[in-house]
Amino acid sequence: LFIPMKPDSPYIHLHERKRTWTPVQVSAGQLLTGGEEVVQRALALRCLEIPVGDFIADAMKGDLPDIKGCKELLASNVIDEEKHDIALNFAAEAHGVSPQFEAEAERIKKAWLELDRHPVLKAVVLERSVFFVLLPIFRFLGDTGLRTTSADISRDEQTHVAANTLVCEELGLKSDKELNKLRRATVAWVLQSLKGEDTSKHLSSNFWMASSDSLYTRGKAEGLLSTRASRMPAFFETNNVNLPQYA
């Protein structure tokens, strides 16, 4: 009887679960009516992908848990962020993002860069309670191309959040009021065009903010449970250019 060997550390276990994928150019399809501006703002925040990678690269120069596989996994996660940036740039090119939103997103990025906190802590707050709201926004308000991009990035981000949470626990890093305030302000900016409540929960700003709050405090959001299964678009209903490509 063959019994598979258990990985030497949780970092190695996470690394082994990764799946390789290739960013593809997408075409613009139909967005959910009423959600167009939210998608534009969420796409503008793609400018945070590279800084998150930089936060992790920065952390690798200092103290990290002396656990097998930790540095290798974090280095691999930095490369993922570059890939996410390429994939989201393809989506932004397809849909077009207003220069006003791009400029405002850059100011939000500046606020995250200037906040003096441990880089892994900033990364985990962004990934867990901002990116994991933006990705379901692409899925529920977006088109086929955005849903595919969201699914590919989500798989990576699950690994990133798990790894960065482990690092924060090992180093005794905890979030605080300032970080939480910036997290809420970032999500609120994305949701500006939505009413608090709407007949469609996905067009309700309260739904998305409650999801971010829950992800921040508890690491999960019941309202987003339906996004856990990687729902892939059916091949017969999809333009080939919008289908996932696995290396």
Residue ranges and their predicted role:
Residues 2-247:
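Non-heme di-metal
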